[in-house]
Amino acid sequence: MPSLLLLFTAALLSSWAQLLTDANSWWSLALNPVQRPEMFIIGAQPVCSQLPGLSPGQRKLCQLYQEHMAYIGEGAKTGIKECQHQFRQRRWNCSTVDNASVFGRVMQIGSRETAFTYAVSAAGVVNAISRACREGELSTCGCSRTARPKDLPRDWLWGGCGDNVEYGYRFAKEFVDAREREKNFAKGSEEQGRVLMNLQNNEAGRRAVYKMADVACKCHGVSGSCSLKTCWLQLAEFRKVGDRLKEKYDSAAAMRVTRKGRLELVNSRFTQPTPEDLVYVDPSPDYCLRNESTGSLGTQGRLCNKTSEGMDGCELMCCGRGYNQFKSVQVERCHCKFHWCCFVKCKKCTEIVDQYICK
C-alpha cells in the first residue's frame, strides 16, 4: 500500500511539474529581457538556470549558445508586438497578463489565436537571429552564404552581407521546438495533438520569414549611373511577415489527433494544410466576457469605433452590451512650416473628440 501511495504521489508531482512548465514560456524573455552577452561573464550555467520559462532542453541550448539569448528575447518581443498590432481591433487583442506565462491561460487552449501566437513568435526568433548574424553579433554565424540566384543578371555582383536566414531558421527550429519535442504523451492523446499543433505552427512561422526573404541590390557608378549592382539576401519587413501569418490565421485548418498520433482534418472536404499553414485543435473561447478559467479578459473597457461595421465596431466589439461615450482631448502637430535651412516648425493643436468604450 505505501508503495502505491508513493507512486501516486510521484505521478502527481510529475503532472504538476509539467503543468508549471507549460504555464511558463520562453516568451517571457521578451518581458524579462536578457542583457547583452556581458552578463554571462559570471558563468553560463547559473544565469541560464535563472532565466524564466525555459524547458530543460532550452536551458541546455542556453548554456551552449549564451550570446544568442538576448536575441531570442528580442525575437519574442518582436513577435508579441506584431501579434498585438494584427489583433488590435479584435475582441482578443493579444494582451500580455504577466511576466511568466505572458498571455495567461488562454494559451492552454489550442485555438486559432494560440496558433497565430506560436507562429509569429517563432518567426520573430528567425528574424532576430538572422539579423544578429549579419551584424556580427554572434560568434557562430556571419553573413548569409546563400548561393547566387540563377535569375540574377550576370553583370550584377552577388556578395553583399545578407541576413543569414538559413542559420536563423535552423537555430530557431532547434530552440523553439525543444520544448515540444521533449514532451512524452500517449499516442493519440489530446496532449499529443496539442504538441503536434504547436510544432506545425512553429514551422509555419519560420517558413514565413524564410520564404519572404528576397534579393536586395545597391547601385554603384558615377553620378548614380548604376553601371554596377551589388546584391544580397535580405529579410522582408516583419510587418509583411505578420500580414502573411494573419492571412494564414484567417484560413487556419481545424484538426484532430488520430489513434496513430497524427493530425487529420476535422472536415475531410477541406484542403490538407501544408507546412506553411496554421492549424488548431480547439474552438476559440468566448472573448466577450472575462473568464478566469479560459483566460479571456473580456472586452469591457475596450475602445470601439461607433461608425464601423467591422470587428472594431461597437456592436461587435462590445458583444451587444452597449457602450459609453466620453470626451477626449487630443493634441496634434499642426500648421507645420518649412524654414530655410533646414527644419520644420509646427504648432500644437488641441481637439476635443468623442470616444466610445464597451460597457
Curated annotation (Swiss-Prot):
Q: Where in the cell is it found?
A: Secreted, Extracellular space, Extracellular matrix
Family in the record: Belongs to the Wnt family.
Q: Where do glycans attach?
A: N93, N99, N291, N305
What GO biological process, any one, is recorded here? Answer: neuron differentiation
**Which GO cellular component does the record give, naming just one?**
cell surface
Q: What is its main location?
A: secreted
**Subunit structure of this chain's protein:** Interacts with PORCN.
**Lipid modification (O-palmitoleoyl serine), residues:** S223
Instruction: Output the PTM entry.
Output: Palmitoleoylation is required for efficient binding to frizzled receptors. Depalmitoleoylation leads to Wnt signaling pathway inhibition.
List, alphabetically, the CDD domains matched.
Answer: Wnt_Wnt5b
Which pairs are disulfide-linked?
A: C83-C94, C133-C141, C143-C161, C217-C231, C219-C226, C288-C319, C304-C314, C318-C358, C334-C349, C336-C346, C341-C342
* Gene this protein is translated from: WNT5B
A GO molecular function annotation here is:
signaling receptor binding
Name this protein carries in UniProt = Protein Wnt-5b
Cited InterPro entries: Wnt (IPR005817), Wnt_C (IPR043158), Wnt_CS (IPR018161)
- What's the source species for this entry? Pongo abelii (Sumatran orangutan)
- What are the alphabetically sorted keywords of the record? Developmental protein, Disulfide bond, Extracellular matrix, Glycoprotein, Lipoprotein, Secreted, Signal, Wnt signaling pathway
Entries under SMART domains matching the protein: WNT1
Do you know which PROSITE patterns this protein is assigned to?
A: WNT1 (PS00246)
What superkingdom does the record give?
Eukaryota
